[in-house]
Amino acid sequence: MRLLLLNGPNLNLLGQREPGFYGAMTLKAIEADLLAQAEAEAVQLECFQSNFEGALVDQIHQAIGQVQGILINAGAYTHTSIALRDALLGAAIPYVELHLSNTHAREGFRHHSYLADRAVGVVSGFGALSYRLALEGLLAHLRQPQQVL
């Protein structure tokens, strides 16, 4: 099984940007942890980060027929990007939306997601652990899609 992890804008600054919201782990450390978890599950995981919306859309398009699921932390694009929503819907690949911080405990403009209503699930507020929980949930869905979790 192959999965894609997408990280959006400013996530390359993890570990130095607002650690009170996002924690002290770098994106590289989070990815290394998730790659180890994926390997233990016999899953191939590709990681990609971009600050550019179009690059994320391109990755989703390239994933069609190549991956069975997507983990996406779209960062601020979660609240603004109809293009990412359309790409995910067009690709028809199951995805889990994830966030380090609890977006509903933050500014009002972060309460709306253009991605959540079509996601398999949403994980937020657990810091770096959100990535592990999202992977676990996506794998459970892909391995037993008919079972209500």
Swiss-Prot record:
Family: Belongs to the type-II 3-dehydroquinase family.
The protein, known as: 3-dehydroquinate dehydratase
Function: Catalyzes a trans-dehydration via an enolate intermediate.
Reactions listed under catalytic activity: 3-dehydroquinate = 3-dehydroshikimate + H2O
Entry-linked SUPFAM superfamilies: Type II 3-dehydroquinate dehydratase
Pathway: Metabolic intermediate biosynthesis; chorismate biosynthesis; chorismate from D-erythrose 4-phosphate and phosphoenolpyruvate: step 3/7
Lineage of the organism: Bacteria, Bacillati, Cyanobacteriota, Cyanophyceae, Synechococcales
Pfam families reported for this sequence: DHquinase_II
MF GO annotations: 3-dehydroquinate dehydratase activity
EC class of the enzyme, as a word: lyase
InterPro entries assigned to the protein according to its UniProt record, in alphabetical order: DHquinase_II (IPR001874), DHquinase_II_CS (IPR018509), DHquinase_II_sf (IPR036441)
Coiled-coil regions listed: none
CDD domains the record matches: DHQase_II
Subunit structure: Homododecamer.
Keyword terms, alphabetized: Amino-acid biosynthesis, Aromatic amino acid biosynthesis, Lyase
Enzyme Commission number(s) from the entry: 4.2.1.10
GO BP: amino acid biosynthetic process; aromatic amino acid family biosynthetic process; chorismate biosynthetic process; quinate catabolic process
Residues reported in the UniProt entry to bind substrate: N73, H79, D86, L100, S101, R110
Ranges that cross the membrane: none
Catalytic residues identified in the record: Y22 (proton acceptor), H99 (proton donor)
Sites marked Transition state stabilizer: R17
